[in-house]
């Protein structure tokens, strides 16, 4: 039987796997009555720029759950090493005409669709840019010092110079701005498959940050500075932080 394909040009993909070492079954973790993946999906389908939003998984439990709440879900190989590889397989198999694709982490239940729209518009308005990702300024000392939050420095043209789990730049003056990286990436098709074809690189392995692989191979990543900064779910204990955030922002659409 021939596999279904879609004609969408701009696609949002939410990679979701069951076997997280830090939090097994994380996509189905409940947050105030809805699963993590459902909250993320329902935020992103409000996008004004994407033609299609899908969850990409290798687990039948996740697929069944997404279909149950009315979402779109596609099955991928369990061999994918990370979310970007899962998105690349999804695009290659199901979206042969996609020109812009956005990798949206399924652990961002409070991520607003406006962040995704800003990335897509950046690519639409600047044909020379191949890949773009959001950053948000922070003054929170815990966020700056913890290795669970990734920091980014970039040049005056908005091109990323480096990403690190360490505080960068080193702060000699209080007014030095620090930017947190938000784990969402918008690619042009050629940039996505160029990344997939590249070999793992020393700094990406040292920091455990796949985006450094792009920089080490001579590619470029532009940043889009956004106001929206919200908690993600990496560990089970993060659920209570997200619930508190949602309760405090109950007037917003989540």
Swiss-Prot record:
Gene Ontology biological-process annotations = CMP-keto-3-deoxy-D-manno-octulosonic acid biosynthetic process; lipopolysaccharide biosynthetic process
**Pathway noted in the entry:** Nucleotide-sugar biosynthesis; CMP-3-deoxy-D-manno-octulosonate biosynthesis; CMP-3-deoxy-D-manno-octulosonate from 3-deoxy-D-manno-octulosonate and CTP: step 1/1; Bacterial outer membrane biogenesis; lipopolysaccharide biosynthesis
Task: Supply the enzyme class, top level.
Answer: transferase
**Substrates-to-products reaction catalysed:** 3-deoxy-alpha-D-manno-oct-2-ulosonate + CTP = CMP-3-deoxy-beta-D-manno-octulosonate + diphosphate
One of its Pfam families is CTP_transf_3
Q: Which cysteines are joined by disulfide bonds?
A: none
Give the highest taxon in the source lineage. Bacteria
Quote the cellular component terms of the Gene Ontology held in the record: cytosol
- Keywords per UniProt: Cytoplasm, Lipopolysaccharide biosynthesis, Nucleotidyltransferase, Transferase
The listed locations are: Cytoplasm
**EC number annotated for this UniProt entry:** 2.7.7.38
- Name of the protein in question: 3-deoxy-manno-octulosonate cytidylyltransferase
Question: Which Gene3D superfamilies does the record match to this protein?
Answer: Spore Coat Polysaccharide Biosynthesis Protein SpsA, Chain A (3.90.550.10)
A Gene Ontology MF term for this entry?
Answer: 3-deoxy-manno-octulosonate cytidylyltransferase activity
PANTHER family for the chain? 3-DEOXY-MANNO-OCTULOSONATE CYTIDYLYLTRANSFERASE, 3-DEOXY-MANNO-OCTULOSONATE CYTIDYLYLTRANSFERASE, MITOCHONDRIAL
Cytoplasm is among the record's keywords? yes
**Origin organism lineage:** Bacteria, Pseudomonadati, Chlamydiota, Chlamydiia, Chlamydiales
What the entry lists under InterPro entries is as follows: Cytidylyl_trans, KdsB, Nucleotide-diphossugar_trans
């Amino acid at each position: 039987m021939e596999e279904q394909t879609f004609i969408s040009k701009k696609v949002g993909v939410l990679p979701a796997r069951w076997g997280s070492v830090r939090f097994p079954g994380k996509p189905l973790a409940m947050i105030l009555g809805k699963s993590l993946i459902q909250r993320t999906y329902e935020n992103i389908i409000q996008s004004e720029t994407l033609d299609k939003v899908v969850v990409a998984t290798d687990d039948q439990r996740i697929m069944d759950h997404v279909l149950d709440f009315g979402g779109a879900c596609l099955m991928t190989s369990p061999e994918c090493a990370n979310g970007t590889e899962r998105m690349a397989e999804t695009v290659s198999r199901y979206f042969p005409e996609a020109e812009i694709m956005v990798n949206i982490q399924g652990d961002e239940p409070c991520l607003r669709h406006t962040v995704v729209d800003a990335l897509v518009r950046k690519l639409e308005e600047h044909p020379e840019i191949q890949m773009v990702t959001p950053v948000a300024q922070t003054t929170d000392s815990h966020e700056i010092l913890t290795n669970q939050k990734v920091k980014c420095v970039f040049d005056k043209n908005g091109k990323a110079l480096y990403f690190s789990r360490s505080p960068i730049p080193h702060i000699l003056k209080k007014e030095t701005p620090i930017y947190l990286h938000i784990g969402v990436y918008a690619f042009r098709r050629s940039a996505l498959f160029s990344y997939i074809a590249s070999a793992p690189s020393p700094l990406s392995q040292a920091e455990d940050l796949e985006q450094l692989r792009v920089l080490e191979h001579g590619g470029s990543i532009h940043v889009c500075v956004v106001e929206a900064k919200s908690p993600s779910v990496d560990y089970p204990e993060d659920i209570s932080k997200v619930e508190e955030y949602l309760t405090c922002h109950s007037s917003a659409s989540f």
